[in-house]
Amino acid sequence: MAAPLTPNAQAYGMLSERTRRRMSDRLRQHGISDERVLSAMHEVPRHLFVDQALATRAYDDVSLPIGHGQTISQPLTVARMTELLIQGRQPGKILEVGTGCGYQTAVLLKTGAEVYSIERLGAILDQARRNLRAAKLVHARLVHGDGNAGLPEAAPFDGIIITAAARAVPAPLVDQLAEGGRMVLPLGDAEQHLWLLEKTAQGLQKTRLDPVKFVPLLGGRG
């Protein structure tokens, strides 16, 4: 649970405009080119999504712990996954599997996506709700549940983003992806890679991309 911001952390937030600009400039240098993604990464105050003790590291390109064995992904990974999901198209309706602290949710909202997000850990989901309220981003539909099962009642989705590493692509999520839709997810156990899946009338087109490291995708609710 993120603690209330101290005066020092609040002051850091007030100065973070320049820091966020440097972060978005770094993302551009690392190949992120979609202006909607760059704008979203600049506009979302990442320091509101981490513990106050880590606020001064919020805009470094590192993953940070958020409690309960979970982490917030490094900014470049968030930007890369978001760009893969929406590049060359309107974001449409997106399912996020693994809400975490809500940062990826916030970035998706800022791109104009209609966001549904599912999280198995109730305590983490409560934290995400608080963080999103603090960032004045309250339009995502947050659900406590098993991400492997997706949200069939809200399907089909134009895009699905999974923020934990699966050993195999969950079949229910493939079923809930619209034809022409994209899914971005890490796959693997000890060795993981980011994958882009595109659903066509002929099936799934799969592209293996960057090596990554994510916490494992688990089933059930906690």
UniProtKB/Swiss-Prot annotation:
<protein>
    <recommendedName>
        <fullName>Protein-L-isoaspartate O-methyltransferase</fullName>
        <ecNumber>2.1.1.77</ecNumber>
    </recommendedName>
</protein>
<comment type="similarity">
    <text>Belongs to the methyltransferase superfamily. L-isoaspartyl/D-aspartyl protein methyltransferase family.</text>
</comment>
<feature type="active site">
    <location>
        <position position="73"/>
    </location>
</feature>
<dbReference type="GO" id="GO:0005737">
    <property type="term" value="C:cytoplasm"/>
</dbReference>
<keyword id="KW-0949">S-adenosyl-L-methionine</keyword>
<keyword id="KW-0808">Transferase</keyword>
<keyword id="KW-0963">Cytoplasm</keyword>
<comment type="function">
    <text>Catalyzes the methyl esterification of L-isoaspartyl residues in peptides and proteins that result from spontaneous decomposition of normal L-aspartyl and L-asparaginyl residues. It plays a role in the repair and/or degradation of damaged proteins.</text>
</comment>
<dbReference type="GO" id="GO:0036211">
    <property type="term" value="P:protein modification process"/>
</dbReference>
<keyword id="KW-0489">Methyltransferase</keyword>
<dbReference type="GO" id="GO:0030091">
    <property type="term" value="P:protein repair"/>
</dbReference>
<dbReference type="GO" id="GO:0032259">
    <property type="term" value="P:methylation"/>
</dbReference>
<dbReference type="GO" id="GO:0004719">
    <property type="term" value="F:protein-L-isoaspartate (D-aspartate) O-methyltransferase activity"/>
</dbReference>
<dbReference type="InterPro" id="IPR000682">
    <property type="entry name" value="PCMT"/>
</dbReference>
<dbReference type="Pfam" id="PF01135">
    <property type="entry name" value="PCMT"/>
</dbReference>
<dbReference type="InterPro" id="IPR029063">
    <property type="entry name" value="SAM-dependent_MTases_sf"/>
</dbReference>
